[in-house]
């Protein structure tokens, strides 16, 4: 079993990289977000999840830059109907924190993407809603937010994830009006 790989990126493809580790090239599948951060010649260290594809009689390697992202994949593939490829697509769109929020809030819109039907989205929410605490979101990145401020921004027409990412930067004990005002300033600049 491979736990992690550290090496130089030789090739970047649409869904994977060739990672050169001591002159051995490993094909490692990555989420779109992680793939965008890789460039030829850059040095990367990836946590590795190995999937034995019995139909093709090969082992596929999936790489992650964070333990949280790897844990999300492990939870997602336990859901009936979610393949490794589907899980990587989800992680390409949502951070572990956003996935956690979408499952907790039963936000089907946030989980909507190509190849993911409503039945599968409902199954993901149903099967993982009790397990999301296992995501162990890093306490520095995930903290309670002011739900009233989030609701106000959504009602003003901002996308839920964008609003969430903006207001999570502010301490939840600030006055709701102040959080909304600061968030609106930031969102109007973007």
Curated annotation (Swiss-Prot):
Transmembrane segments: none
Region (Domain III): 147-190
Coiled-coil residues: none
Chief localisation class: cytoplasm
Gene Ontology molecular function: ATP binding; four-way junction DNA binding; four-way junction helicase activity
One GO CC term, this protein: Holliday junction helicase complex
Ranges where the record places region Flexible linker: 144-147
Domain I: region residues: 1-65
Keywords: Cytoplasm, DNA damage, DNA recombination, DNA repair, DNA-binding
GO biological process, one term: DNA repair
Compartments (UniProt record): Cytoplasm
Domain II as annotated region, ranges: 66-143
Keyword DNA damage on entry: yes
Pfam family, one: RuvA_N
Family per similarity comment: Belongs to the RuvA family.
Quaternary organization: Homotetramer. Forms an RuvA(8)-RuvB(12)-Holliday junction (HJ) complex. HJ DNA is sandwiched between 2 RuvA tetramers; dsDNA enters through RuvA and exits via RuvB. An RuvB hexamer assembles on each DNA strand where it exits the tetramer. Each RuvB hexamer is contacted by two RuvA subunits (via domain III) on 2 adjacent RuvB subunits; this complex drives branch migration. In the full resolvosome a probable DNA-RuvA(4)-RuvB(12)-RuvC(2) complex forms which resolves the HJ.
Domain notes: Has three domains with a flexible linker between the domains II and III and assumes an 'L' shape. Domain III is highly mobile and contacts RuvB.
Function: The RuvA-RuvB-RuvC complex processes Holliday junction (HJ) DNA during genetic recombination and DNA repair, while the RuvA-RuvB complex plays an important role in the rescue of blocked DNA replication forks via replication fork reversal (RFR). RuvA specifically binds to HJ cruciform DNA, conferring on it an open structure. The RuvB hexamer acts as an ATP-dependent pump, pulling dsDNA into and through the RuvAB complex. HJ branch migration allows RuvC to scan DNA until it finds its consensus sequence, where it cleaves and resolves the cruciform DNA.
Protein name in the entry: Holliday junction branch migration complex subunit RuvA
Name of encoding gene: ruvA
């Amino acid at each position: 079993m491979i736990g992690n790989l550290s090496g130089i990126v030789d090739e970047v493809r649409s869904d994977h990289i060739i990672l050169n580790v001591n002159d051995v090239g490993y094909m490692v599948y990555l989420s779109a977000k992680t793939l965008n951060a890789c460039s030829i010649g850059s040095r990367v260290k990836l946590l590795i999840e190995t999937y034995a594809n019995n139909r093709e009689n090969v082992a596929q390697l999936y790489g992650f830059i964070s333990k949280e992202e790897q844990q999300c994949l492990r939870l997602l593939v336990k859901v009936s109907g979610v393949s490794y490829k589907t899980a990587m697509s989800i992680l390409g769109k949502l951070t572990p924190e956003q996935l956690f929020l979408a499952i907790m809030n039963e936000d089907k819109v946030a989980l909507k993407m190509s190849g993911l039907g409503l039945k599968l989205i409902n199954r993901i929410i149903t099967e993982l809603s009790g397990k999301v605490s296992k995501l162990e979101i890093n306490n520095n990145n995930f903290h309670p937010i002011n739900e009233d401020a989030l609701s106000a921004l959504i009602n003003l027409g901002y996308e839920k994830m964008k609003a969430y990412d903006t207001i999570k930067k502010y301490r939840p004990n600030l006055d709701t009006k102040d959080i909304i005002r600061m968030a609106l300033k930031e969102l109007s600049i973007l």
